[in-house]
């Protein structure tokens, strides 16, 4: 674990003792939703989903590690396949540390396993960043977590602070439909990249108040990028938690306008396994603070949550708010317009603030020496133009 803040930047008194919130339920626009803020809650809900499936399981994850949690999930998938459940699993060829041999038992039991974009093919920087688990085409588990022990560890062990949610309702058939397209493309070793680009570009996001947005390398704005960009034109109240915050300048300007005419609260990472992502965010703080945005860096552990509340619209899913998640990686995001859900998720954002360090204009001026500003600008370049796997290897002394 590496903390990216020097002692003078995050004194112990700046953050209160933190405990993960308990699971909570919300019904919004006919969708029954349950949220799991704690790592243990996420893991137990995933295992329960796998253990109780009767007809089908459809999963896709970016990172799948060969560790205790990875083994537990694999064993549950094998058991499901052996009792007659149709099991399908997709992992990303770059993010996952497992291969066909790791899932030999699953395949022997009749399960289907495939890898999205194996390493070192053309266009190696495109990732399947989606996190999807669907049971019996009835309930979907979505969010930001991967299959690795770090994503289920508690804050005191510096586990990733993340969020997962189940949904039951009219949204689930749309998730099933998208998974089918993803699986069809991934299962064909000769499928050209333009095929998945076309699928992302032509995806029907549906009509408000409940929409399923898909992001990816379309050559133009995907349904995810187009919708959030449009919403920010007239937005007046923005609350956001995101692990990686380095948007394009157009979106930064729109966030600044929201802050100037209304209210903007950003809870961003104070710790990460990739210091460059924090530096990239800090390179934008000066302009945001000048516009009146409130910025907080979460202190207890690494932050991985992805949540946007913009007026009465709530965005939940796999996407960070950075160039890669907006324009390059495959992402899945649920958008629901519902005032009660928006109010509840704003309260959830607020629960992070006592455990966060507020970056005031005065504190920013203390941090922002010319040398640090140079390193932050370099970090922004690395995480927006290059790849996280490259920037993660560089210690910029942030």
What kind of feature is each model-predicted range?
Residues 1-398:
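Charged, low-complexity intrinsically disordered terminal segments
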